[in-house]
A protein has these predicted regions:
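Conserved alpha-helical substructure of the radical SAM core
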Residues: 1-122
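Radical SAM enzyme [4Fe-4S]-AdoMet core and its adjacent flexible, acidic
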Residues: 1-4, 116-225
Length: 225
């Protein structure tokens, strides 16, 4: 085969590879019960943008992606557990033979019915944790008590046998606690901890977050449950 023909064949193979959809991210809502200082989506209790897609719309997206060969989906937000259609979408994804179904959550919202849905459908969990220290974690989320809720629900996930991984964002406010936080999480039975950095978009683009130093804020900024 001539070099030019071989190069064209390789290029054609690359193009076919690009036509294959491997992973689908579905942002179900911009709403969130927390107001994390570094949030790239600027999510919060009063979201900047309204939800425009219905559960039926997301079902169609799952179906279209499956028809293109996609076999992995992650439900994100905002906080995806606030979306009432999440259980229905998870069930539909499994019916469409998605092999990997993951929910990326802050871990504060986990009623028994939702936990049962996760277990019944073999859902993988990705959970944001910012520190082993409750004060540091709550300073990032802007919600006193959020650390307690997240850790409690992480323990419930582990006991239920769910596959759990942690997204640990390294910031100046927590940089001295990263190793301690990893050890703390391993003590809960969670080995899969991925350390990440802030994104310089949304609230993450503000000066405090660019250097990774979200502050606790005034009493008006830090809410309680």
């Amino acid at each position: 085969m001539l070099p030019a023909a071989a190069a064209k064949l390789t290029a054609d193979e690359d193009l076919r590879a690009l036509d294959e959809l491997r992973f689908l991210w579905l942002e179900l809502t911009n709403r969130c019960n927390l107001t994390c200082a570094h949030c790239y989506a600027e999510s919060g209790p009063r979201p900047l943008r309204k939800d425009v897609l219905t559960t039926a719309d997301y079902k169609r997206l799952l179906e279209e992606a499956a028809a293109l060969g996609c076999r992995a989906v992650q439900f994100i937000g905002g906080e995806p557990t606030l979306h009432r259609g999440l259980p229905e979408l998870i069930t539909r994804a499994r019916a469409l033979r998605y092999e990997h179904v993951e929910v990326y959550t802050n871990g504060t919202v986990l009623p028994d019915t939702l936990l049962s849905c996760f277990v019944d459908n073999g859902v993988s969990m990705a959970v944001s944790v910012y520190a082993d220290d409750p004060d540091v974690h709550d300073a990032v989320t802007g919600r006193i008590g959020s650390h307690r809720r997240t850790i409690c629900n992480l323990q419930r996930m582990v006991v239920a046998g769910l596959d759990v991984r942690i997204g640990l964002i390294a910031m100046d406010i927590s940089k001295g606690r990263v190793d301690k936080t990893v050890s703390f999480l391993r003590g809960l039975g969670i080995e899969n901890v991925r350390i990440d950095v802030t994104r310089s978009v949304g609230r993450g683009g503000s000066p405090p977050c660019r250097v990774g130093s979200p502050q606790r804020g005034s009493p008006a900024q830090v809410q309680t449950w």
